[in-house]
Design a protein with these regions (language model features):
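Conserved catalytic core of nucleotide polymerization and phosphodiester-bond processing enzymes
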Residues: 1-162
Length: 162
């Protein structure tokens, strides 16, 4: 589908994990937490639940609630979809941060017209207000590595995306 051979894909995957080795251990750690606890928490504490179960053996199986999974597959079951835990952590935390930005902006009387993923479309009255918006967004969530906000302006949204 991607026009890359299996060998090339495996090589790229191996190079990636050599260059950023913490990703694999983070992925394993978050997946294990989801498996053991049935949930993970995003950066701001929102719960992402893993409430469905599937058989331990590899294959195509429908994920089921615990009682149904035990009835259908017996005791050899595990939580389903825990391989998605890292993605839920990252995407969920990004969503938390965007929502926190929107809330902080709202408290200052600034309302976004639309949100698209981690992007906000806001009517801005002046350069001073634009700087205030950037400052609010960069400080909405305190992290060890500071947040950076990219700001673009134009007469309309179409002008910005050309």
């Amino acid at each position: 589908e991607l026009g890359v051979s299996k060998d090339k894909a495996e090589s790229l995957f191996q190079i990636y994990h050599q260059r950023v080795p913490f990703v694999k251990s983070l992925m394993r750690s978050v997946s294990n937490r989801a498996q053991q606890r049935g949930q993970i928490r995003t950066l701001l504490g929102r719960l992402c639940r893993f409430h469905l179960w599937e058989p331990n053996q590899f294959g195509m199986h429908k994920a089921l609630p615990f009682e149904q999974a035990v009835q259908e597959h017996g005791p050899g079951i595990k939580r389903a979809y825990t391989y998605k835990a890292l993605n839920k952590l990252i995407q969920g935390s990004a969503a938390d941060m965007t929502k926190k930005c929107m809330l902080d902006l709202y408290k200052e009387g600034i309302v976004a017209h639309i949100q698209v993923h981690d992007e906000l479309d806001i009517s801005v009255e002046s350069d001073k207000q634009a700087k205030k918006i950037v400052e609010i967004m960069e400080n909405a969530v305190t992290l060890e590595i500071p947040n950076k906000v990219d700001y673009e302006s134009g007469k309309n949204w179409g002008d910005i995306n050309e």
